[in-house]
Amino acid sequence: MMDSPKIGNGLPVIGPGTDIGISSLHMVGYLGKNFDSAKVPSDEYCPACREKGKLKALKTYRISFQESIFLCEDLQCIYPLGSKSLNNLISPDLEECHTPHKPQKRKSLESSYKDSLLLANSKKTRNYIAIDGGKVLNSKHNGEVYDETSSNLPDSSGQQNPIRTADSLERNEILEADTVDMATTKDPATVDVSGTGRPSPQNEGCTSKLEMPLESKCTSFPQALCVQWKNAYALCWLDCILSALVHSEELKNTVTGLCSKEESIFWRLLTKYNQANTLLYTSQLSGVKDGDCKKLTSEIFAEIETCLNEVRDEIFISLQPQLRCTLGDMESPVFAFPLLLKLETHIEKLFLYSFSWDFECSQCGHQYQNRHMKSLVTFTNVIPEWHPLNAAHFGPCNNCNSKSQIRKMVLEKVSPIFMLHFVEGLPQNDLQHYAFHFEGCLYQITSVIQYRANNHFITWILDADGSWLECDDLKGPCSERHKKFEVPASEIHIVIWERKISQVTDKEAACLPLKKTNDQHALSNEKPVSLTSCSVGDAASAETASVTHPKDISVAPRTLSQDTAVTHGDHLLSGPKGLVDNILPLTLEETIQKTASVSQLNSEAFLLENKPVAENTGILKTNTLLSQESLMASSVSAPCNEKLIQDQFVDISFPSQVVNTNMQSVQLNTEDTVNTKSVNNTDATGLIQGVKSVEIEKDAQLKQFLTPKTEQLKPERVTSQVSNLKKKETTADSQTTTSKSLQNQSLKENQKKPFVGSWVKGLISRGASFMPLCVSAHNRNTITDLQPSVKGVNNFGGFKTKGINQKASHVSKKARKSASKPPPISKPPAGPPSSNGTAAHPHAHAASEVLEKSGSTSCGAQLNHSSYGNGISSANHEDLVEGQIHKLRLKLRKKLKAEKKKLAALMSSPQSRTVRSENLEQVPQDGSPNDCESIEDLLNELPYPIDIASESACTTVPGVSLYSSQTHEEILAELLSPTPVSTELSENGEGDFRYLGMGDSHIPPPVPSEFNDVSQNTHLRQDHNYCSPTKKNPCEVQPDSLTNNACVRTLNLESPMKTDIFDEFFSSSALNALANDTLDLPHFDEYLFENY
C-alpha cells in the first residue's frame, strides 16, 4: 500500500491528492483540506447531484486524527449537510487511523498485536484472519496451524507468538499486518474471487488468506461482487432492464444456444457484462498482489464502466426509433422492456404468454372474454388476495360505468419468463407467497424492478443462496447484497417469474410448456399430472423406449384415463425418480387429442415403460376391453358415420405399409415392463391395397376384440381399414356381418342405427326365414345405391353397359373372395344341380366369418391377399362376359313376354274373375311343364360368373338368424312402404304374379300348420332354386318395376298366408297409415325399393 505524502512531522500534506483522476478541490471551510485519496467509499458519487443529472464525487475530509466526513466536491452542493444529523455524519475513524506509526520496541508491538487478536475474535466467531496472519508470518518456520472454523483461540502462553518469528520482516510490514487485523472485524468469512458466485477455496495456501483482507481493505467490496451500470443521462430506466436481463438464467441458456450469436444484441449484452465481471475479478487479485489499490479503484473501474456503456449505448440506439427516447429524458421500463424484446423474435418468445381477460358485470350483466398474447401485462387496483392463479383486479364496466367490478386474467400458456406490471404495487412484499405451479413447472420470482417516488428504478435480483442483489445505478459500480428483500409492497413495479424445473430432465422440460391448461391440473391443486398430456414430439424422445414401434403406427394416448394412469404410482413430480426414471415416452399427435374415441383403435399405444401405469395388469386389460367395446359398437354404424371416422383418421394415420398382418402383442410381466414382439408378420405385398377387402379386415379386427381374459393383448392395425371405407355396399355387408358376432349387444346396436332405411335391415335380420332371398338382396342393393333410378323400361339400367365395369369388378372381386374361403362348417341341404354353385357361396361366406371370429389371423391375411389378386383378374375378364350376359337377358325377356300373353288370355276367362282366391291357388298348376322346362333351360345357359356375381350382390345376410319367431303379419307391416311402386299395382302386375308361380307347378302348396323350421328351410331352398335367375338381380331381369314387386308378392303365396292379408296390407289405407307414421319411418328414402 502506498501511503499519502507526509511531511517531516508525520502529518499528511494539506491539500488535494495527486492521484490520477482526482479533481482539485477548493477550500472547504473550517473543516480543512486534509484529503485522503485512499478513503473513497463504494458510492463515490454524490446522490443529491446524481438526482439532478450531475456526477459529482464524494471526498473524505478529516476533521481530526480520529474523525472524518464525506462531502460533495461541488461547491453548490451541501450534501450531506441537512440530510442527516451531524452526529451521524461525522464517523469515528476506528478501523483505519492513519496516525503515523513511529518505530516501537518489539515488546510493545507484541502486546498491541495480542490485544487486537482478542478484540477481533470477540466480535466474530468465525474470524480466522488473526490466526491466518500468524500463519503467514510463521509460514517459513512451521508454525502451528489452526482450523479456521474453530471459535476457540489458543492461549498466548501455549502458542508460539507469530511476531517473535518475524524478526526478518521490516517494520512497515508488521504495521501493515497489524492494520489488516484491525480492519477485518467486518470482513466476511469467504470472498468470491472466481467470478462464479462460489467462495474461493480455503486451503489453497497461506498467502491467499492474507490477500483477502487486503483486497477487502483496498476495494471495500461486499461478498459475491457483481458489476452494474452507472447512472448517466437519467438512464436508470434502461439500466434496471439490463440488470434484470443479464441475471436471467433462462435468457442465458437461450442465447447460448443461438446459431448466429454475433448478430444477437442480447448475446453482445451478456458478453460485455461477463467481460466487465472478469475484468473486476482479475484486477482485484492483480491489484492486491501488486499492492496498488489505487489502480484498482480508479483505472479498472473506468475500464469496466466503458465496457458496460458500450453495450448500453448500442441498445439505446436500437430502441430509439420505436421508443423515441432522448438522452436525459426519463422513460419507463414498462414501455421499453417489450420494445427491447421485439428486437429479436426468438428472445421475445421466452416472455410471450397467452391469457384471457374474463369480465362479468354484477350490475348490468355485461360480460366478455378477450384472449391476448403479451410479454408484459399491467395490473391496477389488484384485489387483496391477488395471486398469479387468481389474477383479478377492480375496474369499471364499459357498459354501465359501474366501478369496482372484477376482471380476472386466466392463464392459458405461460412462457419460461413471466412478467407483470403493477401500478400500485402488490398487496404484500412476501414474494414466496406469489410462487405458483403451472403445467408441472414451478414459477418463482427472481427479479423485481422497484419504482421510487422520485422517478428512480432499481432492480433486485434473487441470488442462488437466497440473498438479494440491489442493482442501483446510483450506488457505484457494484451491486449491494441484502439478506432480505427490502422493498415496500407499494414500490414493487415489475415482477419477473422464471420457470424452475429441477426434477425433470431437459427432454421432458422441452415438452412441458407445450401442454394445454385443460389437459392436466396445476400442481398447486395437489393433483397428479397425467402422463398422456405430455407430448414428446421429436423422434429423439422415442429412443428411451425399450422397443421401437413401426413408424406408421399412431400411438393412442387416451386408452388409460388420467385417474387410472396415476392410481398405481407415486406423484410424477414428487422426486427425480417419479418422472425421470419412469417417464412414458409416447409419440402423440395433435389430432389424436381431438379424436380420442377414434384413436382407441390403435392399440399399439401400449409401449409402456413406467411403473405407475403398468403396475396393474387388470386395469390395463379392463381399459383396453372398454375401448374395444366402444369400437365394436361404432363399427355397426351408418356409412355417413364411417365417412366421418374416415375423415378423422386421415389426419392421424400414416401411409399404410402394414395393413392387417403386422400385429404386436403387449405382454405385461411381473417386473412392470412391457415386451413387444411380433405375433404374425406375413409377407404379403398385396396387402397394401387394403381397399380390396375392407370387410375382411373388419372381421379380423373384431375377432381380436372378442378374445378377452388372455395373457396377451393382441392389438391390430386398423388404420388402413378405416381409411379405405369407400364403397357403401361393402360397408353395409360388413356391418351386418358384425352384428352377428355381437349377439350380446344386439339391442344396443339396433338402437344406434342412424342411417336411412336401417329399419329394413332390422326387419330382414328378424324375418329372413319368411322373406325370399331375392327380396332381401334387393333391399340391400337399393340401400347402398347412391343415385336415384330413372323410371321406364327403355331407360332401365339392367339392359345398359353404363357403369358395368365398376359394378362387375366389384362383384367379381367379392366372388373370388368368397370362393377362396375355407370349406363351410355347416350348411343347409343343397338345392338342384342347376344352382349348386350359387347356393354354396353364401354359406361359405358365413363359414369364413365363423373362422375369423374364432381367431384365424392367417386366414384373414390370405383372404385379403387373394382378394387383391382376383380383383385385377376379374377386371380383365369383364369384357368377355359382358356381351353374353346382354344376349341371354334379351332372350329371357322375349320368352317372358310370350308367356305374359298366355297369362292375359287366362285372365280374360270369367272363372278367374269370379273366384279370385281359387285362381290364385290353382294358377301354379295351370302352367304346362314344357313352359317351365323352357325357362329353366334358358336359365341354365347363364354362365357361372353371372350366377356368382348375382349371388355375391344379392345373397342374404349370413350373420342373421335363419329361423325367427316373428309372424308374417309383422314382417309385412314393416316391409310395406309408401313408395310409388307399391301404390301403383295393376291387373297386369297381378297377372305377372300368377305367371311367376308357374315355375313351381310341381311343388304342392305347404300346409299352414306345418310352419316350422324344416318347412321354412325347404321353402327357402326351393325358392332359391327357381328364382336364382331372378335373384341374380331383379332389377336387371324384370321388364319393369311392377313385375319386380309382383315377384315379391307371388313368392309369398307359397306360405300359408291368405290372400285377404295381402289385400289388407296392399290397400291404400294401410299404405297411407304407414306413410304418416313418422316414428317408424323418420328418414325413409322414396327410392329405397326402386330399380335402375
Swiss-Prot record:
Residues 810-819 have a biased composition (Basic residues). Residues 821-832 have a biased composition (Pro residues). Residues 148-163, 197-206, 732-748 have a biased composition (Polar residues). Residues 236-495 are annotated as: SUMO-binding. The keyword Zinc does not apply. It is found in: Nucleus, Cajal body. One of its GO terms (biological process) is protein desumoylation. PROSITE patterns: USP_3. Residues 145-168, 185-207, 713-749, 797-859, 904-930 are annotated as: Disordered. Pfam families: DUF4650, Peptidase_C98. The active site is at 236 (nucleophile), 456 (proton acceptor). The modification Phosphoserine is found at residue 909. Interacts with ELL. SUMO-specific isopeptidase involved in protein desumoylation. Specifically binds SUMO proteins with a higher affinity for SUMO2 and SUMO3 which it cleaves more efficiently. Also able to process full-length SUMO proteins to their mature forms. Plays a key role in RNA polymerase-II-mediated snRNA transcription in the Cajal bodies. Is a component of complexes that can bind to U snRNA genes. This is SUMO-specific isopeptidase USPL1. It comes from Homo sapiens. The lineage of its organism: Eukaryota, Metazoa, Chordata, Craniata, Vertebrata. The gene is USPL1.
